[in-house]
From Swiss-Prot:
Motif (Mediates endoplasmic reticulum retention) on chain: 816-819
Main location: secreted
Cellular component GO terms, alphabetical: endoplasmic reticulum lumen; extracellular exosome
UniProt protein name: Thioredoxin domain-containing protein 16
Organism per entry: Homo sapiens (Human)
């Protein structure tokens, strides 16, 4: 059941497929046999039709095949028309009967032959091809005994999606196959075309297609039958998707808040909510009633148990049911219904189900629940026809991975073709390749873990997307920065040299601190860090080296430990061991003592030192400053900040007046979202520049510096003193809104954090043994294209915004160390 066709898997959005390999024109490629077979790739599926020449009896089929190009490519399946010529020797270009078939290949292995009369339209083509590829995910049965055997085998393990369609190849069959493509590794799909089987499970209206959800995972008693929920809407791809979403939602949820403010996945799907009002004295009976109602309304409405005793809002004393419609702005209804059937009837009589027209083939960009809920997936979908120069990167496979990373220093992008974040980051990765074209000594490569999951597992890839750098003689380095072009480019450029740099003379140290030694890298690291140690400080040097190894790709680090190190320490008033921080943009050098400081503390010190005193806030760097948990003192400017304002604020920073705040400025031209922020603070919007204090972490108050006063030191100090004394009035209070999951059962990040915290903290392990980054595969020369590789079900989506990137770097570094500190030979 859980092995599957893994060209692409869609985890975030189903209806809107986030697929990169989308042609700009939906046309059927025409190739020669030799050319066609040369394009086949291991693990990739391809449908081909061989013909001598167009004839009246094949022209209709070719039209339908042309229509199937786009939907099949959505699933990573290529389609081609192969023109046979007399000189060509091929078993597929031989007899007339061979020319009346289409052939499905996976790699160079023939999987199925389809007579063209069974591929009568685009629905039949898509349905048959997916059916052939999903042979493990979809069980075809003909009798009740087979269904009972599958049901018994999966009790307590997994749920079943059972479908009846009138015939193979019709639109309903295609819809089921498309659902199986997405959910086949989560649920066991069972299909039948036998009316007798449908009748035997008690179905009515057997002339129509049916789809049931068998709730077998909850069944622990093998003698108990699995509950069954019938999908009452027509069998379309979208309806099946929405139905499965409701099956995944919690059956019953307890709430203790205003029903008008409650939102669940049901409302997002256009379904109403039913609140069963409970109180402490009748809680158990009310919960049993609510569960019974929930089973009756499963797939039709969401059911919640509303705890009256915990509510701050008033509910009429006699009301025992609250009904909330899916339409926005409609007030909730307070009802008195003492019979379960009355509750069911009220819901069914008041449901407003909007008909959704599906257009499988036209390139519509209508609203989709998942996509509208996920801006990354939506962006990838809208950019799906953007042609990227993929040839600037090398695509790796199981056969080529080892040889490539051992032959040259390589950057490897591990991604999943079905995942929106991966596909968005792939665009940034290609943009980096464009910038580095012809200048980088690093080989930029990529591997699709949806196709080559074994490789990704061996490389300890446990989340998507992830970048790893492989250098000969060094441990693999994982990139843990922002998933954008500039940050990744900085990471690659700074990794051109090894860290920490070993400085061998006073003159070289001065050149290092001035930026002359590595002036081509100063563009990517405005701060250079030099560790000063006496030759006998072995432990301190080891800790610093470990910290520098952590931070490589993010900051330039060097170490000086010669006999004359006291000359440098005296010059810069630094007591050994110490750090010298050279801020190149400001032309100043600071010293920080390192007495009894461990590697992780050094990482923290350097990370904090990278923060600017008066930074320009951008979308990329906001998390770094937001994590400081201080009120933000923001100067909003419509362009470059006035030098006088900057000087005044920096003076207060140096005089320690602003230690309790995070002073920063925001350029509305560079970061247009700032205008939306100001509109939330002011009505109407006053003229710029504007100095605002935002207390995000405590209370949400927003204070504005008086616009009739000049932004000078004296006025700022007076204003801050008034704020401290409580003499200034806030202009607004930001609502305490959080981006919460729709229901507690969807709070996956807290579950992950809880599991992580239980493991306890560990010190950074040291490398005890060196092993090769790759093991020799004795089966290297076997035909692996026929092997159905399992998708990595445990892979987690990488957090999109890293608020504390050095901690993520630490995790990645630990994982690579725990692999045995493997090195590329």
């Amino acid at each position: 059941m859980f092995s599957g066709f893994n060209v692409f898997r869609v985890g975030i959005s189903f209806v809107i497929m986030c697929i990169f390999y989308m042609p700009t024109v939906n046309s059927l490629p025409e190739l020669s046999p030799q050319k066609y077979f040369s394009t086949l790739q291991p693990g990739k599926a391809s449908l081909a039709y061989f013909c001598q020449a167009d004839s009246p009896r094949t022209s209709v089929f070719l039209e339908e095949l042309n229509e199937a190009v786009r939907p099949l490519q959505d699933y990573g399946i290529s389609v081609a028309k192969v023109n046979c010529v007399k000189e060509e020797i091929s078993r597929y270009c031989g007899k007339e009967k061979d020319l009346m078939k289409a052939y499905l290949f996976k790699g160079n292995i023939l999987l199925r032959e389809f007579p063209t009369d069974t591929l009568f339209d685009v629905n039949a083509i898509v349905a048959h091809v997916l059916f052939a590829l999903l042979f493990s995910e979809v069980k075809y049965i003909t009798n009740l005994e087979d269904l009972q055997n599958i049901e018994n085998a999966l009790k307590g393990k997994a749920n079943i999606i059972f479908s009846y369609v009138r015939a193979i190849g019709i639109p309903e069959h295609r819809a089921v196959m498309e659902a199986a493509f997405v959910y086949g590794t989560t649920y066991q799909f069972v299909l039948t075309t036998e009316i007798a089987l449908l009748e035997s499970i008690g179905s009515e209206d057997v002339e129509y297609a049916h789809l049931y959800f068998f709730h077998c995972k909850l069944v622990l008693d093998l003698t108990q039958q699995c509950r069954r929920t019938l999908m009452e809407q027509p069998l379309t791809t979208l309806n099946i998707h929405l139905f499965i979403k409701t099956m995944k939602a919690p059956l019953l949820t307890e709430v203790a808040e205003d029903p008008q403010q409650v939102s669940t996945v049901h409302l997002q799907l256009g379904l109403p909510l039913v609140f069963i009002v409970s109180q402490q004295a009748t809680y158990e009976a009310d919960r049993r009633t609510a569960e019974w109602v929930a089973w009756r309304l499963l797939g039709k409405a969401g059911v919640l148990l509303l705890l009256r005793d915990s509510l701050e809002v008033n509910i009429p004393q006699d009301a025992n049911v609250v009904f909330k419609r899916a339409e926005e702005g409609v007030p909730v209804e307070f009802l008195v219904l003492h019979d379960v059937d009355l509750i069911i009837s009220h819901v069914e009589n008041n449901m407003h189900i909007e008909e959704i027209q599906e257009d499988e083939d036209n390139d519509m960009e209508g609203p989709d629940i998942d996509v509208q809920d996920d801006e990354v997936a939506e962006t990838v979908f809208r950019d799906r026809k953007r042609k990227l120069p993929l040839e600037l990167t090398v695509e790796l496979t199981e056969e080529t991975f080892n040889a490539t990373v051992m032959a040259s220093d390589s950057i490897v992008l591990f991604y999943a073709g079905w995942q929106a974040v991966s596909m968005a980051f792939l665009q940034s990765y290609i943009d980096v390749a464009v910038k580095l074209k012809g200048t980088s000594t690093m080989l930029l490569t990529r591997i699709n873990c949806a196709d080559w999951s074994d490789v990704c597992t061996k490389q300890n890839v446990t989340e998507f997307p992830i970048i790893k750098m492989y250098k000969k003689g060094e441990n693999p380095v994982s990139y843990a920065g922002m998933l954008g072009t500039e940050d990744l480019l900085k990471f690659i450029q700074l990794n051109r040299i090894s860290y920490p740099v070993n400085i061998t003379s006073i003159q070289e140290a001065e050149e290092y601190l001035s930026g002359e030694l590595y002036k081509d890298l100063i563009l990517y690291s405005s701060v250079s860090v030099l560790g000063l140690f006496s030759p006998t400080m072995k432990t301190a040097k080891e800790d610093f080296s470990e910290a520098g190894n952590y931070l490589k790709g993010y900051v330039i680090t060097g170490i000086y430990s010669e006999e004359d190190v006291l000359l440098l320490s005296t010059k810069y008033a630094a007591s050994l061991p110490a750090l010298l921080l050279a801020r190149h943009t400001e032309g100043k050098i600071e010293s920080i003592p390192l007495a009894s400081t461990h590697a992780q503390d050094i990482v923290q010190i350097i990370t904090d030192a990278l923060l600017e005193m008066f930074p320009e806030i951008t979308v990329e760097n906001l998390p770094s400053y937001f994590r400081l948990q201080k009120p933000l003192l923001i100067l909003f400017s419509d362009g470059t900040v006035n030098p006088q304002y900057k000087k005044a604020i920096l003076t207060l920073v140096k005089q320690k007046y602003l230690d309790s705040f995070t002073p920063c400025w925001l350029n509305l031209k560079n970061t247009p979202v700032g205008r939306g922020i100001l509109r939330a603070y002011f009505d109407p919007l006053p003229p710029l520049p504007l100095l605002v204090l935002v207390n995000l972490h405590s209370g949400g108050q927003v204070f504005a510096f008086p616009s009739d006063q000049a932004i000078i030191e004296e006025n700022l100090v007076l204003w801050l003193k008034k704020l401290e004394a409580g003499l200034e009035n806030h202009i607004t209070i930001l609502p305490a809104q959080e981006w919460k999951p729709p229901l507690p059962a969807y709070d996956f990040l807290s579950m992950i954090d809880a599991a992580t915290s239980q493991r306890g903290t560990r010190k950074v392990p040291k490398c005890m043994k060196e092993t090769d980054v790759q093991e020799n595969d004795k089966e290297q020369h076997e035909d692996k294209s026929a092997v159905r590789k399992e998708p990595i079900e445990t892979l987690r989506i990488k957090h999109w915004n890293r608020s504390n990137w050095f901690k993520e770097a630490e995790k990645s570094f630990r994982r690579d160390k725990e692999l045995g500190c493997s090195k590329v030979n």
